[in-house]
Amino acid sequence: MGEKPLPVRNFKVARDKQDKRNAMISWNPSSDAYGYNIYYGIAPEKLYNCITVNGADHYDFRGLDLGTTYYFAIEALNESGRSALSKVVKQ
């Protein structure tokens, strides 16, 4: 069994200025990862929702509530497990 993937770097969340219900999430891909779990929620310690993205370095998030602050974090995935969770990003 190999090593767990390296943590994700340069994780960014940018809410759309014209439609704040949408956000572009991007990151630098880990060379040893095949996918990523993006966690999000309305409090930094309550990231109860998860989106899994395979083979990409971005995700176009749609459906955020207007006037609500969201918090996001990401981890990389491979056959050996998951990386450490990134720092939480507020948006």
Language-model segment annotations:
Residues H58-L64:
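Exposed aromatic-hydrophobic patches
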